[in-house]
C-alpha cells in the first residue's frame, strides 16, 4: 500500500515539474533588438564594441540554438539594420569576430536568411 502511494506521489511530482518548467525563450525581434542595442554606438562609428555589446552578441548566439532561431535572428537583424541610420556594414560584419563569437553566416544586408541552417 505504501509503495502505491509513493508511485502516485512521484507521478504527481513529475507532472508538476513538467507543467512548472520554464519554456525555452523563443527568439523574437524584440529580444534581438534588446541584446544588440548596446552595439549601435560601435556600428555607427565608435572605436570598439563595448563589453555590454559583446555580452549581448554572446547571449543572442547562445539563444539561437536551432536553425529556426538563427533564421529568425537573421531576419530581425536585417530589418533592424535598415531602420537604424548610419550603420557601418563592415563593422557589422566584423562584430561577431570582435566579440569572439562564431556565427554560421555573414552579417550583411544581402544575407539570404532562408538559406541558414
From Swiss-Prot:
Gene Ontology molecular function, alphabetical: lipid binding
Disulfide pairings: 29-76, 39-53, 54-99, 74-113
Listed Gene3D superfamilies: Plant lipid-transfer and hydrophobic proteins
Entry keyword set: Antimicrobial, Disulfide bond, Fungicide, Lipid-binding, Plant defense, Signal, Transport
GO biological process: defense response to fungus; killing of cells of another organism; lipid transport
Leader sequence segment: 1-26
Highest taxon listed in the record's lineage: Eukaryota
Its job: Plant non-specific lipid-transfer proteins transfer phospholipids as well as galactolipids across membranes. May play a role in wax or cutin deposition in the cell walls of expanding epidermal cells and certain secretory tissues. Also has fungicide activity.
Protein family: Belongs to the plant LTP family.
Listed name of the protein: Non-specific lipid-transfer protein
Encoding gene, per UniProt annotation: IWF1'
Amino acid at each position: 500500500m505504501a509503495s502505491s502511494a509513493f508511485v502516485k506521489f512521484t507521478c504527481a511530482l513529475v507532472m508538476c515539474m513538467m507543467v512548472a518548467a520554464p519554456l525555452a525563450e523563443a527568439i523574437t525581434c524584440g529580444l534581438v533588438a534588446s541584446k544588440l542595442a548596446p552595439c549601435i554606438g560601435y556600428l555607427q562609428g565608435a572605436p570598439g564594441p563595448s563589453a555590454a555589446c559583446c555580452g549581448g552578441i554572446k547571449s543572442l548566439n547562445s539563444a539561437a540554438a536551432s536553425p529556426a532561431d538563427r533564421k529568425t535572428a537573421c531576419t530581425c537583424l536585417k530589418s533592424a539594420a535598415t531602420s537604424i541610420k548610419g550603420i557601418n556594414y563592415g563593422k557589422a560584419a566584423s562584430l561577431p569576430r570582435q566579440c569572439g563569437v562564431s556565427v554560421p553566416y555573414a552579417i550583411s544586408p544581402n544575407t539570404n536568411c532562408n538559406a541558414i541552417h
